[in-house]
Design a protein with these regions (language model features):
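Structural motif
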Residues: 29-35, 60, 85-88, 116
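A short, well-structured beta->alpha microelement
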Residues: 8-13, 52-75
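Single conserved hydrophobic/aromatic residue that forms the stacking wall/gate
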Residues: 153-162
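Cofactor-cradling patches in redox/metallo enzymes
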Residues: 81-100
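N-terminal basic/disordered segments at the start of proteins
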Residues: 6-44
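Hydrophobic or amphipathic alpha-helical targeting/insertion segments
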Residues: 97-140
Length: 162
């Protein structure tokens, strides 16, 4: 008789830590989707004069807990607003969400966590620190997509907390 051993690991346990080396910015957008990040970059570049500074990062590079902790210390801790778009819900980046939420609570950073797959996910709403009305507006903008919608996000309204 043969015994088969199976090893169960989370995504973060199979990754190698990465330091993105990004400096702080007023706004930070994190997503697993390169098209999301490209749209935000394009929108920001069109109207960069007068806009807050912006950093973009693909969450693929932030799977390992050490990568998350380093990014929080070096980049996110200096942000005024953070937008995270997740495909698949909390379980796909749970450690990161918990750490970023804790940072946002401690430093008063406006945090919006949105689904990137077009589905409602009330669990993600619980990680956001901004008013529900602002969160709904951001969901509509990001679901619309394109650089114009992303430009509207990078032009935050002070009354909205971003």
């Amino acid at each position: 008789m043969h015994v088969v051993f199976r090893e169960a690991q989370g995504l973060e346990e199979t990754e190698i830590p990465i330091d993105l080396g990004q400096t702080p910015a007023d706004l930070v957008v994190l997503s697993f989707s390169d098209s999301d990040l490209g749209a935000f970059s394009e929108g920001w570049k069109k109207e960069r004069e007068g806009l807050p500074s912006l950093r973009l990062a693909n969450l693929v590079a932030l799977k390992h807990p050490t990568s998350v902790d380093t990014y929080i210390d070096q980049t996110l801790s200096g942000a005024k607003g953070i937008l995270i778009r997740l495909i698949g819900g909390v379980q796909y980046w749970e450690y990161g969400l918990n750490q970023v939420y804790q940072l946002a609570q401690e430093k008063g950073i406006a945090l919006a966590v949105l689904p990137a797959d077009g589905r409602e996910d009330t669990r993600l709403d619980e990680y956001s620190t901004i008013p529900k009305s602002t969160l709904q507006r951001l969901k509509k903008l990001t679901d619309t997509g394109g650089s114009k919608a992303c430009l509207l996000y990078t032009s935050p309204s002070p009354r909205d907390g971003l």
